[in-house]
Amino acid sequence: AESYCITGDGKVEKGIRDDAEHGDLVGHEDVYLPSGRGEETYEPFWFRTFRFIRLEVETGADPLRLLPPSYLETGYPLEATTRVESSASWVNGVWDISLRTLKRCMHETYEDCPYYEQLQYTMDTRSQILFSYMVSGDTRLAEKAMRDYRCSLMPNGLLMSRYPAREPQVIPMFNLYFIFMVEDYYRQTGKTEHILKSWLDRGFRLLAFCGLG
């Protein structure tokens, strides 16, 4: 789970997120039944982001030996080449949290949240791309994000607000962030190949829909 919650009367409310004394963990859960045929390892099929883990073990007549749980870190291999250091310790802490938050939101796509939706929303993604530009010269995931959004084009000229996604969703204002992304990319790299080949036409269609083209 990502937080301890106050539960009762069918409601779940977040208070102090690490208050284990008064709260309860509410979140994703798995049920695993050992076969009893020797040492076994369990891993979920999709990555899980967490702050807290709770294990509940029920045994039968046979003994069960439980080894200490471990985790594997996964994500986009962002190599940070920028570093922020300050004599004020809180600045260093904020920098560490900010960089780890960015990395947790980078896998095959950018994600608005690594625990809940895990979806690539245009407005969130633009902010994450700008942060990526500041800490690394790697533009590959940014380029992929713009290719992804290009593939979400609908007949009326709008892009989906999040993509790839199983269910379509359109937030008209979010389309402008795609145009901002393209401008940011040009200012960062000076490259025009992807813009002219893949993204410029989408930008013109969006502007036309907004009555600006």
Where on the chain are the PLM-derived regions?
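Extracellular/oxidizing-compartment recognition motifs
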Residues: 1-112, 124, 140-145, 158-164, ...
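Helix-terminus loop motifs that line ligand-binding clefts
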Residues: 3-25, 137-213
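Short, flexible active-site loop motifs that bind/organize anionic cofactors or intermediates
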Residues: 43, 118, 185
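Aromatic- and histidine-enriched alpha-helix N-cap/loop-to-helix transition segments
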Residues: 48, 116-126, 137, 169-177
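Noncatalytic linker/hinge segments flanking ATPase motor cores
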Residues: 95-99, 111-114, 126, 172, ...
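Helix-boundary and N-terminal cytosolic regulatory elements
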Residues: 129-130
